[in-house]
């Protein structure tokens, strides 16, 4: 008979803990820390632990190192799970256990009754190898068929980020890889806090912070702190790091909005809007014109009459040489703030660009029919 998955994290302080450092598209996203249920499924837990450390050498079946390092998450299905562990073929057809190609289903003690559970992928009964999946929702149809052998105790936000990557079918469009992995011993740093020298003392994902997400005052304090760090990076023209900090603010704000009353959400809106606009400004500096436009559209969803969003969106259109679109946005901005000199100057500049473009076209046609 299957049991409900453990509520405590960890469920047993003596169980081993392992970690994955995850990269998406060559960029570090964060760390997932997992507890392995060695007290319930010792053989399955030991297989996974050893594959995290790489201590067992080379596989007898694959001829490849028995190690998850460099192994991709090859299959992602939103509102279901993320799957990895094929270290040999990297596409779901390979891998092997530390005991040989396959080993038996140890037991089905725990149910797949929530997100963040670690379970063995298989090709039928008693075909466990190295492939695994992490649930992102309850998956009761897998009970009695797949062995639940661990849980995410930190880094659920990283798993959710993986869940939401763009896919072609079930294959991630960007390479999602376990860049580093290993075992965490008693007293080891779990690596949840940033080490970028910025003074940021907050976990990258709010799920890992020991805070009450319903405490709006606390969320605002953290958000202001992170925004200020982002502003420091902006001033030093480190656009990518600035974007990371502004995006982190939005994660904290969105997580809080999901659990608070509607009346309190408006208190978080100004800082969220400011950070979305700042992300747009960074993207303009990076010549990521479409990205800047997308950020400004997000800001305009929050505040349809925001002139800063319209102005920056117009700059994005100019980067794409879509001057008529830029003109339309600047005219809207001028209607809202008729006395704004920056908008007036930008409007004049765009009109001159449109005229120059038309003059150039006329000259081309004149040559053609001369």
From Swiss-Prot:
It comes from Mus musculus. It catalyses: [protein]-peptidylproline (omega=180) = [protein]-peptidylproline (omega=0). Its EC number is 5.2.1.8. The modification N6-acetyllysine is found at residue 171. Identified in ESR1 or NR3C1/GCR steroid receptor-chaperone complexes. Found in HSP90 chaperone complexes with kinase clients LCK or EIF2AK1. Two monomers associate with one HSP90 homodimer. Interacts with HSP90AA1. Interacts with HSP90AB1; PPID and FKBP4 compete for binding to HSP90AB1 and the interaction is mutually exclusive with the PPID:HSPA8 interaction. Interacts with HSPA8; PPID and STIP1 but not FKBP4 compete for binding to HSPA8 and the interaction is mutually exclusive with the PPID:HSP90AB1 interaction. It is found in: Cytoplasm; Nucleus, Nucleolus; Nucleus, Nucleoplasm. This is Peptidyl-prolyl cis-trans isomerase D. InterPro entries: Cyclophilin-like_dom_sf, Cyclophilin-type_PPIase_CS, Cyclophilin-type_PPIase_dom, TPR-like_helical_dom_sf, TPR_rpt. Residues 19-183 form the PPIase cyclophilin-type domain. The modification Phosphoserine is found at residues 5, 198. Transmembrane segments: none annotated. It comes from the Eukaryota. CDD domains: cyclophilin_ABH_like. GO terms for molecular function: FK506 binding; Hsp70 protein binding; Hsp90 protein binding; nuclear estrogen receptor binding; peptidyl-prolyl cis-trans isomerase activity; transcription factor binding. One of its GO terms (cellular component) is cytosol. Keywords: Acetylation, Apoptosis, Chaperone, Cytoplasm, Isomerase, Nucleus, Phosphoprotein, Protein transport, Repeat, Rotamase, TPR repeat, Transport. Residues 185-215 are annotated as: Chaperone activity. PPIase that catalyzes the cis-trans isomerization of proline imidic peptide bonds in oligopeptides and may therefore assist protein folding. Proposed to act as a co-chaperone in HSP90 complexes such as in unligated steroid receptors heterocomplexes. Different co-chaperones seem to compete for association with HSP90 thus establishing distinct HSP90-co-chaperone-receptor complexes with the potential to exert tissue-specific receptor activity control. May have a preference for estrogen receptor complexes and is not found in glucocorticoid receptor complexes. Less sensitive to inhibition by cyclosporin A than is CYP-18. Residues 214-370 are annotated as: Interaction with HSP90AB1. Belongs to the cyclophilin-type PPIase family. PPIase D subfamily. The keyword Acetylation applies. It holds the Pfam family Pro_isomerase.
């Amino acid at each position: 008979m299957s049991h409900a998955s453990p509520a405590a994290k960890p469920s047993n302080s003596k169980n081993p803990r392992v970690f994955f450092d995850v990269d998406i598209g060559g960029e570090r996203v964060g760390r997932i820390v997992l507890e392995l249920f060695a007290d319930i499924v010792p053989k399955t837990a030991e297989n996974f632990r050893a594959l995290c450390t790489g201590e067992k050498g080379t596989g007898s079946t694959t001829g490849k190192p028995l190690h998850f390092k460099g192994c991709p998450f090859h299959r992602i299905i939103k509102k279901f799970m993320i799957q990895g562990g094929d270290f040999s073929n990297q596409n779901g057809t390979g891998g092997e256990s530390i005991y040989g190609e396959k080993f038996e289903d140890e037991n089905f003690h725990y149910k797949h009754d929530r997100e963040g559970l670690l379970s063995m992928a298989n090709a039928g009964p008693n075909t466990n190898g190295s492939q695994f999946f992490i649930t992102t929702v309850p998956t009761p149809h897998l009970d009695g068929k797949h062995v639940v052998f661990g849980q995410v105790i930190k880094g659920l936000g990283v798993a959710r980020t993986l869940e939401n990557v763009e896919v072609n079918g079930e294959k991630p469009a960007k390479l999602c890889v376990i860049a580093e992995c290993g075992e965490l011993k008693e007293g080891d740093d779990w690596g949840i806090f940033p080490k970028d020298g910025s003074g940021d003392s907050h976990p990258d994902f709010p799920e890992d912070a020991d805070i009450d997400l319903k405490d709006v005052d606390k969320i605002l304090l953290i958000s202001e702190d992170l925004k200020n760090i982002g502003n420091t990076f902006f001033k030093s023209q480190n656009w990518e790091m600035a974007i990371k900090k502004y995006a982190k603010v939005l994660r904290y704000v969105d997580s809080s909005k999901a659990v608070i009353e509607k009346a309190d959400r408006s208190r978080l809106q100004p800082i969220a809007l400011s950070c979305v606009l700042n992300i747009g400004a960074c993207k303009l500096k990076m010549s990521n014109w479409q990205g800047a436009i997308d950020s400004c559209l997000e800001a305009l969803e929050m505040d349809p009459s925001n002139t800063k969003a319209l102005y920056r969106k117009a700059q994005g259109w100019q980067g794409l040489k879509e001057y008529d679109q830029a003109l339309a946005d600047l005219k809207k901005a001028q209607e809202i703030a008729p006395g704004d000199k920056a908008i007036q100057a930008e409007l004049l500049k765009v009109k001159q660009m449109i005229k120059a473009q038309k003059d150039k076209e006329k000259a081309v046609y004149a040559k053609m029919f001369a």
